[in-house]
């Protein structure tokens, strides 16, 4: 009997319980994702110098974000960065996600060299009706952070519409702001 690759699924209930407002924060909680490669906080990562857009690329198994394929509802997302070296997970607000599927085995035989370490598929809520907002604010010493997300959805006889977005802002925290650094 043939066996397939295991799929790690993070469903809507787990997404809500995680208490995150961004997709990148949610993906950090999946054990198979060792990092988000080049990101706004890790510019020294692989391809970090070319990441002027501050994108967050998914990094399975620590090989690099260019070896992990990121899909939105089974379709490829356009690449980010000045050299197209990664796909930005932060372009999809976490509030719109119905579930996240992670295949942490190589999928290059199906998807090509973009999926050497695996595939992450973001599945959106396509039939949401109503309004929902999430606001998170945090303060610690000389650092503060604000994250806001909202989703709106409506449906009619022949279709539906879902619009979602998120906003995040944080102050910088330099090493000199810490007395022990």
What are these language model-derived features?
Residues 1-20, 80, 127-134, 170:
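N-terminal periplasmic "start-of-domain" segments of outer-membrane beta-barrel proteins
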Residues 5-28, 48, 57-63, 86-90, ...:
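Short, polar/charged loop or turn motifs at beta-strand boundaries
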Residues 15, 27, 100-101, 120-122:
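Non-catalytic regulatory/gating segments with a bias toward low-complexity or hydrophobic composition
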Residues 25-26, 56-59, 88-90, 114-135, ...:
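N-terminal periplasmic accessory domains that precede
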Residues 28-76:
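Extracytoplasmic beta-strand/coil segments of soluble accessory domains associated
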Residues 75-104:
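Short acidic/polar hinge/loop motifs at secondary-structure boundaries
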Residues 106, 128-153, 163:
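Short strand-turn segments of transmembrane beta-barrel domains in outer membranes
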Residues 136, 158-181:
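Periplasmic-side early beta-strands and strand-to-turn transitions of outer-membrane beta-barrels
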């Amino acid at each position: 009997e043939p066996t397939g690759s295991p799929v790690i699924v993070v469903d809507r209930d787990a997404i809500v319980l995680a208490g995150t407002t961004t997709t990148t924060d949610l993906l950090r909680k999946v054990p198979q994702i060792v990092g988000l490669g080049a990101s706004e906080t890790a510019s020294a990562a692989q391809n970090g110098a070319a990441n002027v857009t501050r994108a967050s690329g998914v990094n399975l198994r620590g090989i690099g974000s260019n070896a992990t394929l990121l899909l939105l509802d089974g379709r490829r997302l356009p690449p980010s960065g000045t050299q197209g070296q990664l796909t930005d997970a932060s372009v999809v607000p976490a509030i719109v996600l119905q579930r996240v599927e992670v295949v942490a085995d190589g999928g290059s035989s199906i998807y090509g060299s973009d999926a050497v370490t695996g595939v992450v598929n973001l599945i959106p809520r396509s039939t949401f009706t109503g309004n929902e907002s999430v606001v998170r604010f945090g303060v610690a010493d000389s650092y503060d952070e604000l994250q806001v997300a909202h989703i709106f959805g409506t449906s009619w006889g022949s279709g539906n519409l879902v619009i979602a977005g998120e906003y995040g802002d944080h102050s910088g925290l330099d090493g000199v702001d810490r007395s022990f650094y």
